[in-house]
Amino acid sequence: MKVTVGPDPSLVYRPDVDPEVAKDKASFRNYTSGPLLDRVFTTYKLMHTHQTVDFVRSKHAQFGGFSYKKMTVMEAVDLLDGLVDESDPDVDFPNSFHAFQTAEGIRKAHPDKDWFHLVGLLHDLGKVLALFGEPQWAVVGDTFPVGCRPQASVVFCDSTFQDNPDLQDPRYSTELGMYQPHCGLDRVLMSWGHDEYMYQVMKFNKFSLPPEAFYMIRFHSFYPWHTGRDYQQLCSQQDLAMLPWVREFNKFDLYTKCPDLPDVDKLRPYYQGLIDKYCPGILSW
């Protein structure tokens, strides 16, 4: 079964790590022109219209029982081969290869942190939501807090939120909205997608990974925070301490993508060992 997930608007025009293959950086995350602009805009228009406090809470209720599927982490990785991600017109290969490429990039740069290697393998597994029938605007893309006014660095902020009912609700339409100053991102309701879902899967199944790993998974698509430097009014000191880890992971999130595919069969035993160490057995999804 193949499910079209793309285009993932958060993954368009991102650079490679290798400077020899990197393009002009001005062309990356370009939301003013380009062949994919219309469909990327449409994706964000749907996202920014429908991602409300009530919608996100309904998705937590819908998926919070973790009763959709029982499978191991490696089975979830293999399921990514059934996802057709149309966000990258230049490189066409299964998402599972990207998982291993990201993990191997981290492994090379941080050989002493095996838990970090596993984060690379895990980070996009929440995209199995697409196999459960979720629309792509509720699976992929940059994330943002609901329940408060969107900040300036949110993609298409000025042109896609007009029909979002929360912005007509005085509880949710101010800079702080329903939150207290510096309440901490752990008390913030994030827009629903593969980041938040995978974070919840990890918590429910009691992954024995360090807090940094949970932050990387939950916030790797929160570009308005880790790159746009917005939403500081919600951050606690713990969030600021974790921010360098999220940014470090961001270097490898798709930046390691290249047509030289890894030999997955040779890599599987190493990563299966990490799975057995940190998140073994059949998990609830």
UniProtKB/Swiss-Prot annotation:
InterPro entries: Inositol_oxygenase (IPR007828). GO terms for biological process: inositol catabolic process. Binds 2 iron ions per subunit. Kidney specific. It catalyses: myo-inositol + O2 = D-glucuronate + H2O + H(+). The keyword Phosphoprotein applies. It holds the Pfam family MIOX. Fe cation 1 binds at residues 98, 123-124, 253. Disulfide bonds: none annotated. The modification Phosphoserine is found at residue 33. One of its GO terms (molecular function) is oxidoreductase activity, acting on NAD(P)H. Pathway: Polyol metabolism; myo-inositol degradation into D-glucuronate; D-glucuronate from myo-inositol: step 1/1. Belongs to the myo-inositol oxygenase family. This is Inositol oxygenase.
